[in-house]
């Protein structure tokens, strides 16, 4: 097990690189990224970009090669962050090729293996216990529920067995709010 920290500056600046026209132009013309790949980068939002960066750090840390595979989840999409891109453009100025070069070099190509920790049993338990505040004090869960997550070997498999019911609730929510109608 491992914990990997990603700086918000990395994922937010890459959000601009992947979604502003000058960033896409830089990736295509200077880096040589295929146009089809560039168009798919908008599938990644801030969290998805952070997940991708975790994979890069993980691969560098373990000195993986082209023969290895690392997978992650695109947990969100850039479509959720158009207003954030506008805010960043307002705060940092219009996005240009020089900014794209900086962002590529510093926030993607320059990813380092700092802020990572291979976890021992006690490290994992210490991180697990950080849930106390958010789960018990904020969400009203019990300490017994937190311990159940740690000690009950069936807790997470039982949770995954609820996927169909959770999907049904998500679909009902989406229908009720009309959230998908505007996408």
Listing of model-derived features with the role each one plays in the protein:
Residues 6-11, 50, 74-79:
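Glycine-rich beta-alpha junction loops
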Residues 55, 81-84:
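A short acidic (Asp/Glu
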Residues 51-59:
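Buried hydrophobic packing segments
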Residues 60-67, 79:
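Non-catalytic interaction/regulatory modules that flank or connect domains
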Residues 1-43, 83-183:
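Active-site/ligand-binding loops adjacent to catalytic centers
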Residues 42-50:
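Short glycine/threonine-rich catalytic loop with a Thr-x-Gly-x-Asp
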Residues 6, 58-61:
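Short hydrophobic alpha-helical module
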């Amino acid at each position: 097990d491992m914990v990997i920290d990603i700086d918000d500056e990395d994922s937010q600046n890459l959000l601009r690189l992947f979604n502003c026209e000058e960033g896409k132009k830089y990736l295509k013309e200077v880096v040589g990224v295929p146009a089809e790949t560039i168009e798919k980068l908008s599938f990644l939002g801030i969290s998805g970009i952070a997940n991708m960066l975790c994979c890069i750090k993980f691969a560098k840390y373990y000195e993986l090669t082209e023969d290895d595979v690392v997978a992650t989840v695109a947990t969100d999409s850039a479509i959720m962050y158009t207003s954030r891109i506008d805010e960043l453009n307002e705060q940092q100025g219009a996005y240009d090729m020089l900014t794209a070069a900086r962002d590529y070099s510093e926030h993607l190509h320059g990813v380092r293996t700092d802020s990572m920790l291979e976890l021992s049993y006690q490290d994992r338990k210490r991180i697990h216990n950080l849930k106390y505040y958010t789960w018990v004090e904020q969400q009203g869960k019990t300490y017994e529920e937190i311990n159940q997550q740690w000690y009950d070997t069936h807790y997470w498999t039982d949770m995954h067995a609820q996927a169909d019911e959770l999907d049904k609730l998500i679909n009902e929510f989406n229908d009720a709010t009309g959230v998908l109608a505007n996408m």
